């Protein structure tokens, strides 16, 4: 079945093409750290031949605690993204939380992301669609894979068909997430074979019901990423940090930056193998 291709500049994103890495840090902690992390990602992905898009948030508007670090904000965040693009020649993805942010962010970055908690907010969807930018839609933890077709339809009605879908797990009881590997195929089907990517980092979150921040299971990041990529996906969404224990957001789920090359070597091998197979139709 023909898979839809979304172009991010010269990077082609599709379920049957070599996977694209959307990788970086959870939130911009400082200009210098962003430069360090981006440089390492660029070095490793160029060595391994993996198409790469840098990711980070300029504002984490949905932190559990009012006292948690949110980021540098819109103005400073866009300056950092511009410097990363100019210095390393990378594409950039970041999330927006309000309709008023959509165009200013789209003027700087290459992909704008619709957060999971906001994915059904029609005003925000319409504002993002109007920018004409490539869109990454995070599947809400509380929405089934089959419902994602409705969100894609909203973007199409808004005149934007450059849509990527991203799964980050589903609620499993209270304070836990699981990833349904069958859901990836459902999301492809209901969206007209839009590219589907896997956010392995946030799928590893495990909340403390009485805590002010999310916990995580980064010790299982490799096995979960390998399982997801074995389905045959357009990309992987990954967060890393040189010192996860002291990261300002989601450190417990972040891959240690020093392990990036070893990790991606395994992921690329699985992606290459899976996409070397002929498509097998078992419905007919």
From Swiss-Prot:
Pathway: Carbohydrate biosynthesis; 3-deoxy-D-manno-octulosonate biosynthesis; 3-deoxy-D-manno-octulosonate from D-ribulose 5-phosphate: step 2/3; Bacterial outer membrane biogenesis; lipopolysaccharide biosynthesis. It catalyses: D-arabinose 5-phosphate + phosphoenolpyruvate + H2O = 3-deoxy-alpha-D-manno-2-octulosonate-8-phosphate + phosphate. Keywords: Cytoplasm, Lipopolysaccharide biosynthesis, Transferase. GO terms for molecular function: 3-deoxy-8-phosphooctulonate synthase activity. It comes from the Bacteria. It is found in: Cytoplasm. Its main location: cytoplasm. It is an enzyme of class 2 (transferase). Belongs to the KdsA family. GO terms for biological process: keto-3-deoxy-D-manno-octulosonic acid biosynthetic process. InterPro entries: Aldolase_TIM, DAHP1/KDSA, KDO8P_synthase. It comes from Salmonella arizonae (strain ATCC BAA-731 / CDC346-86 / RSK2980). This is 2-dehydro-3-deoxyphosphooctonate aldolase. GO terms for cellular component: cytoplasm. HAMAP family: KDO8P_synth. NCBIfam families: KDO8P_synth, PRK05198.1, PRK12457.1. The keyword Lipid biosynthesis does not apply. Its EC number is 2.5.1.55.
